[in-house]
Amino acid sequence: MIPKGYYYMFNTVFIILEIVGTIAFAISGAMTAINRRLDALGVIILGVVTACGGGLLRDIMLGVFPQSLFIDSLYVIISASTSLLLFIVFYIIKDDSLTEKKWYNDLLTITDAIGLGAFVVVGADVTISKMAEGLNGNVFLIVFMATITAVGGGMLRDIFAAKVPNIFCNKSISTWYFLSAFKFFFAFS
């Protein structure tokens, strides 16, 4: 169990993780939209859906109403701003061949990995907090919700972009994040 004196330190760490994950997933969503040649609104929507969609799905499944996304708009603002900034950069560059370069796909993979890593921890923490408030559940609920939080936005991004979700195509990634949720639970229980 975490000593009570460390609560604020861990709270700060989780806020930083949420912000880092939000920026990473917003970049991932915006890059997918740019690759699909969407306009500015499409880029912003795909960026916000990717960054905030997993938490929205988690909150709906946990029965949280209104969902966190609608209470604290900071993460929507961060993801929309990040997506718009990326759109502007690519609009200024005006080089359609950039999305076909290796570094572009590598950056997409890296931002996905950062977002997944951050949100699997955040998803587990939020679920544990809800269980402390009286939600019935066990380790499987925590692991499932952590996984949904981590992969939900990316799944929605890929569905909106008319692609098979990456999480279903790369089995090793989904397995590692599922196991990471177990690890987080046992580390703090």
Regions found by a protein language model. Name each.
Residues 3-52, 56-131, 135-143, 166-189:
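Alpha-helical transmembrane segments and their membrane-interface boundaries
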Residues 54, 152-153:
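Forkhead-associated
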Residues 145-151:
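Generic alpha-helical transmembrane segments
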Residues 153-163:
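Membrane-helix boundary/interface segments in integral membrane proteins
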